[in-house]
């Protein structure tokens, strides 16, 4: 019988901590705006980001924290333009980005409430922060 997803999340967290693993989230999806305006990331960008992770290129690069989702965003990557790294810079209309990011982070926050009390407090605090 499958267990609640919070059980598997806890097991993953313990394994990552005990083995001192780095975890990377690479956006290979959509950038630059809503459907009809934005575009998928080019495969060359995905490959450059993955190569950067595998070759340790991010070990000495500065990161900035995304104010909506709390993700650490690298300031540079060989072969990738800066606007491909920073989600807001990929959008022509920065106000549209802010509105969309705020709405999406609110949806994440609301959905995650069902996990309250089932996951560690640090996990709850790491989630999106709607503005």
Description of each model-found segment:
Residues 1-131:
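Conserved NTP phosphate-binding and transfer environment spanning the P-loop NTPase/kinase superfamily
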